[in-house]
Amino acid sequence: MPASSNFQEAIREAQYGALVGPNVVNKALPYVGGGMVLTAGGVMGGLALMASNPAGFMPLFWVALIGNIVLFFVAQNVALKGNNSTALPLLTAYSLLTGFTLSGLVAMAIGTAGIGAIGTAALATGITFVAASVIGRRMSDSVGQALSGAVGLGILGLVIAMLVQIVGGLFVPGFGSGGFELLIAGFGTVLFVGAAFVDFYTMPRTYSDDQYLAGALGMYLTYINLFIFILRLIIALNGGGRRE
């Protein structure tokens, strides 16, 4: 799951309900869309490499994963300072690397449920975005803060569950697959649907208009995570998480 620490920070800063950046959402949305396009390009690059040079994919995957984590924190810090001319190329590289690191999951989804799984996940993510953009902007402070708190606690619970899944799988073969994977994938999907609505509430209460790239990064992470968990859910429902 890509980093989401800035989302939790946004929840804390949005508790008072006052608008900090009334135009930040509209300024951020084109960059969220651009990030998604770049991510798709990174996925296609990863799939092409897996097809042409499977042995070379994993070493590059680990390099990309480490670089992706470092880039996230650097880009977030620069974007929060409003230094958008420097943040933009960093976020461009981050989006491409994110796509590359997701290519293995996409390949697994295609192998398990067919190419239609990618279209289903993308369509569901897009529908969530449209609904969240309409409802999230009109959310009252009481509802917005309550949902923000619930999503924040949910993210904490999800991280703990995923750590248990990873550690348990190291000691007990098959521990993290099957029903456990289905539960995590389903919970993650519901959680990030909620986070999508929260984003439209918290962003103008957290970021100034000059911090639109920081806001775009947070929203981008929400939709990337939603896409990931929908794919994981599709894979689990099609038996891809089972081990004989």
Language model features: what each stretch is:
Residues 1-244:
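A hydrophobic alpha-helical transmembrane-helix feature that marks the membrane cores
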